[in-house]
């Protein structure tokens, strides 16, 4: 009875049983059996990008005379269905497989071949009218097709998802910066009291940190637009028409609306993946910025009654199973964990990028998985961060004013008038005796009360005045 649920598929290794109803074939089945490692599946974004490559390649191969029109049309129809996500359940392979990504490339080739067979009432696995290698993979090698798919999926994820979300997060912090421009607060360096600034100025730093990260990520795309497709096995273009890479890149640019081009030096973009490593590094830089911002927000909101408590963060859910009424900065904590995860993923990509040998880097699935996973993590985290926290942050004006008035570092404004040493003496006396700065200054006789009130004005200390 079990035999009725299986079919026999053939490849260069011989025969193998494959579940009767699935669209994948022999090579995919072998990978499933040999690499049942964890549950990390190849990202569907990469599968869709590979399908776009097959679609574009079929069109170009026909135009260049190495594929007939029937084969072209069958491949384009099936590949378009795969690229649109209609058959995502037919791509079960794990990330942890051969380092070239060959198994996943063949998974796509086999599914497209079998979709064509279905459409023509041919048996699954018959390779009629379209063969997975001879036709779907025509003029390609996994060595150029798989990294091309990573480039495409990464550019799409960054351009269509991550960058627009960052722009909204930048705008959210910009609105806070504008709204808080009149709130003067005490600054802190070394986690100790420092001179004043406005809460708006503090928020402007968060805004511009993210804006700088946005700019760096956007700039990294320049290295991802050139595609290795057309280099085939080692970059020479063996078994591909001379214009295949150039024309297929142009076709992919047309399909995606993104400025892809054919890499001038296929050897460089196939033997190494520096552009992908750089893009991942810029995601790490974004994570570093978001981690710092989350730490700032947690510190400024700590309390609510026994901490800094300068900010009120939105209260979204109970924070403790034992302490009634406790609310935690959970969005900051989630963001911090995402940031640390991305930083770790970047370390793996960096090692993988430098570990290629000669004409081939055999860490492609890891690089692609970590890069695309990081894009997804950062996009999702930034979206929830903005909607569930940043938009709802409110200042605690009473606490901010109280702390400002208590700070000894306002004495810094006196230093240009009476000198550093005398200003220090005022601060030490005030701290030791519990005096206000004004009381200490007048007691020591270093400044008149009129001059003190004129000089030690927090509103005048938030910008250069000499």
Curated annotation (Swiss-Prot):
Tell me a GO cellular component: cytoplasm
Q: Which family does it belong to?
A: Belongs to the class-II fumarase/aspartase family. Fumarase subfamily.
Q: What is the protein named?
A: Fumarate hydratase class II
Catalytic activity line of the entry: (S)-malate = fumarate + H2O
Name the species this protein comes from: Prochlorococcus marinus (strain MIT 9313)
- InterPro entries with a match to the protein in the record: Fum_hydII, Fumarase/histidase_N, Fumarase_C_C, Fumarate_lyase_CS, Fumarate_lyase_fam, Fumarate_lyase_N, L-Aspartase-like
Q: Which residues form the active site?
A: 190 (proton donor/acceptor), 320
Citing just one GO molecular function, the answer is: fumarate hydratase activity
The protein's superkingdom reads Bacteria
Gene behind the chain: fumC
Keywords from the UniProt entry: Cytoplasm, Lyase, Tricarboxylic acid cycle
Q: What does the subunit comment say?
A: Homotetramer.
């Amino acid at each position: 009875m079990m035999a009725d649920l299986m079919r026999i598929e053939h490849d260069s290794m011989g025969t193998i049983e494959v579940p009767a109803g699935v669209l994948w074939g022999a090579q995919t089945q072998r990978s499933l059996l040999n690499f049942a490692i964890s549950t990390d599946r190849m990202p569907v974004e990469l599968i869709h990008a590979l399908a776009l490559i097959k679609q574009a390649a079929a069109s170009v191969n026909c135009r260049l005379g190495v594929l007939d029109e029937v084969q072209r049309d069958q491949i384009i129809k099936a590949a378009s269905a795969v690229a649109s996500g209609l058959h995502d359940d037919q791509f079960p392979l794990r990330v942890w497989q051969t380092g070239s990504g060959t198994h996943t490339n063949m998974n796509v080739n086999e599914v497209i071949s079998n979709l064509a067979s279905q459409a023509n009432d041919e048996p699954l696995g018959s390779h009629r009218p379209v063969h997975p290698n001879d036709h779907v993979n025509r003029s390609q090698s996994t060595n150029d097709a798989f990294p091309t798919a990573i480039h495409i999926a990464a550019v799409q994820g960054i351009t269509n998802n991550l960058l627009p979300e960052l722009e909204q997060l930048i705008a959210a912090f910009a609105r806070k910066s504008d709204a808080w421009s009149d709130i003067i607060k005490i600054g802190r360096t070394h986690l100790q009291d420092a001179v004043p600034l406005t809460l708006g100025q503090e928020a402007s730093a968060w805004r511009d940190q993210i804006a700088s990260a946005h700019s760096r990520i956007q700039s990294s795309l320049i290295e991802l637009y050139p595609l290795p497709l057309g280099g085939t096995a080692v970059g020479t273009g063996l078994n591909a028409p001379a214009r295949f890479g150039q024309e297929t890149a142009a076709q992919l640019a047309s399909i995606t609306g993104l400025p892809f081009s054919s890499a001038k030096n296929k050897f460089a973009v196939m033997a190494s993946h520096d552009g992908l490593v750089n893009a991942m590094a810029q995601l790490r830089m974004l994570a570093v910025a978001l981690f710092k911002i989350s730490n700032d927000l947690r510190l400024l909101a700590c309390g609510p009654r026994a901490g800094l408590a300068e900010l009120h963060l939105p209260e979204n859910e109970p924070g403790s199973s034992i302490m009634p009424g406790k609310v935690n900065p959970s969005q900051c904590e989630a963001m911090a964990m995402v940031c640390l995860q991305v930083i770790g993923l970047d370390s793996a990509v960096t090692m993988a990028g430098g570990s290629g040998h000669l004409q081939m880097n055999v860490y492609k699935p890891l690089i692609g998985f970590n890069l695309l996973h990081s894009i997804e993590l950062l996009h999702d985290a930034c979206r929830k961060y903005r909607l569930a926290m940043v938009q709802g942050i409110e200042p605690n004006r009473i606490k901010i004013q109280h702390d400002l008035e208590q700070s000894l570092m306002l004495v810094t404004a006196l230093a240009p008038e009476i000198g550093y040493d005398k200003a220090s003496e005022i601060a030490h006396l005030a701290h030791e005796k519990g005096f206000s700065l004004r009381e200490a200054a007048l007691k020591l006789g270093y400044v008149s009360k009129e001059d003190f009130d004129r000089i030690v004005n927090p509103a005048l200390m938030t910008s250069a005045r000499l």
